Amino acid sequence: MPRLRVCTACRDARRLFIRRNSVKISIIVPVYKAEKHLAATLDSLIGQTHADLEIICVNDGSPDTSASILEAYAARDERVRVIEQENQGVSVARNTGMAHATGDILMFVDADDTLVDAACARVHEVFATRQPEALTFGLECDPPEVAPASLRRELAPRDAVYDAFAPDLLFKEHARPYACRTALSADFARRERIMFEPGLGLAEDQVFYFAVYPFA
């Protein structure tokens, strides 16, 4: 499966400055057998230009060296929080991360994804100026040539705002709801009791956002 490198539509967003009174973003990272890509993922998160973050890594009983990698990063950067649990699947791991999140905005990054350095700054800017309950942004495959045909037209949705859920959001905007390309208002997630469906390990984010969008 190709690695996904999450990006924002605004290429000059990396010029944004960190605001002293900025809103905290909670980034939830489920970890299982992730030793190959985990360091690159965490490097991309701690290197964000928006520094007011908490990076919640949920080690879902990973049998490889992921735990030691997480321990090293937590010792290096206090924003990295590690939660250990027995293996229960990616949905439960994300729910665990959401339950421990203290930020105003929730983001989901898989342990083989990376963010461009201004991704969180751009997400923060959109939430500050437009106050959405759910935000979908662009992504790209790394390397680009390995992107499956089914994914190519969904990589960069246009800049659009929906005041209420509409089927066009999914079927005309091609804003397919992969977890790694979406941010949520934490207040909205708590109010609507948004969770991933335990037991689902395939297309779990698709089911999750079919529950999210109608309430946003």
What spans do the regions from the language model cover?
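Cysteine-centered motifs
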Residues: 7-10
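Nucleotide-sugar donor-binding/catalytic module of glycosyltransferases
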Residues: 17-216
